[in-house]
């Protein structure tokens, strides 16, 4: 593995796209990391401004620069709009640097699905190791380039993975119906009328119904497809007037009844070595995970025998920057929880 030993020197890290909410969250977490030094912050729309002009509560003394192909840092974290990282990552990787991309540019293996859900073309080679530590810890540790999961995808995959990948005998899933609610920060920092206070206060709405870009990412990771006729997956994303957090309610119809105890044992065993996944006895809440890298999971049964899985994450931390730092820790040989607890 191409690790940079923690004890030898501090690792230099630069953030491309540091002016957005996820980028700023990266800066906040990186400032707490004992093994790294923030080298540069790139944001072409804010070039020349000091980071603290945008985020006074985060005491980073860096000035935003314009990225023009620099490869002087050991690690590059990219928090750019979809489509932009495709142009930058190949050059950074070719220079022998480590990369973690937070966009959706390198997640999907199926190029037709990428075009359908994201727009634009990409080649079949434009896929990086998927960065979900709870599922791919060893692969991430041996990688030099990672595609960070999406925020909704993180909350839903972690809720479903034990059912699809845990190997419990007699547990067959017929369909999954997901309603997931996100805080407004999930829509990004750019000004949009529909996200303004007067539009969102006291309001709530569904969006991208039937066409959210995280749907094929979820299916790919769970080992099925959005076009598989034998499996029914319905995902309804919603936005609500709070700042951060994703609350996902997953209603899972099973082919035959199962008892709660073996299901809880399945989840507990599956995540036994996952420091950021917590199986809760009661119903979890967004406030339980806000500003943390935790994913909380609650389990219950409906009267018809359907399994109800509830997950809660912070969309900017576990759903973005925190998971990226978790991946970086694994890539570089740091403790997985460094700067996150």
From Swiss-Prot:
Keywords: Amino-acid biosynthesis, Arginine biosynthesis, Cytoplasm, NADP, Oxidoreductase. SUPFAM superfamilies: Glyceraldehyde-3-phosphate dehydrogenase-like, C-terminal domain, NAD(P)-binding Rossmann-fold domains. Its main location: cytoplasm. PROSITE patterns: ARGC. GO terms for biological process: L-arginine biosynthetic process. Pathway: Amino-acid biosynthesis; L-arginine biosynthesis; N(2)-acetyl-L-ornithine from L-glutamate: step 3/4. InterPro entries: AGPR_AS, AGPR_type-1, NAD(P)-bd_dom_sf, NAGSA_dehydrogenase, Semialdehyde_DH_NAD-bd. It catalyses: N-acetyl-L-glutamate 5-semialdehyde + phosphate + NADP(+) = N-acetyl-L-glutamyl 5-phosphate + NADPH + H(+). Coiled coil: none annotated. The keyword rRNA-binding does not apply. GO terms for cellular component: cytoplasm. SMART domains: Semialdhyde_dh. Catalyzes the NADPH-dependent reduction of N-acetyl-5-glutamyl phosphate to yield N-acetyl-L-glutamate 5-semialdehyde. This is N-acetyl-gamma-glutamyl-phosphate reductase. It comes from Chlorobaculum tepidum (strain ATCC 49652 / DSM 12025 / NBRC 103806 / TLS) (Chlorobium tepidum).
């Amino acid at each position: 593995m191409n690790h940079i030993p923690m004890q030898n020197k501090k690792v230099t890290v630069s953030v491309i796209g540091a002016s957005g909410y996820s980028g700023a969250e990266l800066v906040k977490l990186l400032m707490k990391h004992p093994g790294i030094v923030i080298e540069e912050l790139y944001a072409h729309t804010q070039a020349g401004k000091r980071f603290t002009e945008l985020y006074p509560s985060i005491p980073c003394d860096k000035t935003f620069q314009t990225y023009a192909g620099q490869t002087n840092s050991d690690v590059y974290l990219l928090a750019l709009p979809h489509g932009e990282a495709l142009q930058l990552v190949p050059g950074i990787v070719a220079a022998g640097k480590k990369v973690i991309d937070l966009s959706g540019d390198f997640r999907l293996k199926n190029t037709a699905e990428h075009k359908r859900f994201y727009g634009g073309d990409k080649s079949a080679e434009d896929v990086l190791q998927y960065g979900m530590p709870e599922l791919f810890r060893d692969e991430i540790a041996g990688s030099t380039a990672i595609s960070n999961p999406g925020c909704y995808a993180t909350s839903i995959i972690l809720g479903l993975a034990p059912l699809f990948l845990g190997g419990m005998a007699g547990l067959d899933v017929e369909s999954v119906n997901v309603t997931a609610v996100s805080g407004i920060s999930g829509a990004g920092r750019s000004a949009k009328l529909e996200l303004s206070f007067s539009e969102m206060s006291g309001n709530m709405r569904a969006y991208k119904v039937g066409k959210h870009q995280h749907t094929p990412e979820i299916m790919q990771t769970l080992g099925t497809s959005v076009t598989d006729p034998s499996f029914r997956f319905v995902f309804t994303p919603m936005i609500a007037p709070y700042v951060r957090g994703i609350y996902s309610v997953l209603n899972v119809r099973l082919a035959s009844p199962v008892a709660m105890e073996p299901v809880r044992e399945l989840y507990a065993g599956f995540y036994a070595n996952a420091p950021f996944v917590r199986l809760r006895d009661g119903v979890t809440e967004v406030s339980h995970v806000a500003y943390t890298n935790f994913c909380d999971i609650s389990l219950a049964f409906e009267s018809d025998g359907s399994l109800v899985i509830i997950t809660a994450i912070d969309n900017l931390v576990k759903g973005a920057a925190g998971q990226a730092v978790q991946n970086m820790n694994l890539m570089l040989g740091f403790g997985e929880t460094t700067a996150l607890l």
